[in-house]
Amino acid sequence: MLEAHQLSKEVSSPEGTLTILKDVSFSVDAGETVAVVGPSGAGKSTLLALLAGLDLPTRGHVDLNGANLSDLDEDGRALVRAESVGFVFQSFHLVPSLNALENVMLPLELAGHGDARKAARAIIDKVGLADRWSHYPAQLSGGEKQRVAIARAFATEPAVLFADEPTGNLDSRTGANIMALMFELNRNSSTTLVLVTHDNSLAERCDRILALDIGSLVSDARTAA
């Protein structure tokens, strides 16, 4: 359902061409959970952006749910994301002028869902915020904000969820609770999960671990999960 074919990403810098990713290839099956690990600067977030069609590779291509993302213009890639992809980021990316329920309703309304409010309330309840749905992001704790972000990501029942350091701004206890919630929702929905993390214990909960170093894929290993 997700394939990376010899992905390379290069950018110009004052010192010349900078290689961020070099010839990265792998595939991810439907429903699989995959962690992407590596030191800072290894290219993890760049890889995630390419896999989601938020950026295009210098060479190579990504197939997502049967679509070659490099063959599509930005509108075409946006349509694929709207139909197939959910995102959870370290910094939450909630709309500050919308309350929790409205933030979750937003992708449902954009997708033309018949009853966005009812669907959003249902998943808000699932993530444990039944009594906080009317609160705005500024009124929520970090853990609550991430619960809203997770609810928003799963609301449209995406084929694949991309999570970039989703516990990076949370304390260890809150982060553990958030990841337990994310893995539970992932199991229940059979969504494919691609997770960028520095947390080895979190990576071990995934089916596979992809390790990047200096832009190259140096390991692709199955876990005991």
Where are the model-predicted features located?
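ABC family nucleotide-binding domain
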Residues: 2-214
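Conserved beta-strand-loop-alpha-helix hinge in the C-terminal portion
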Residues: 216-225
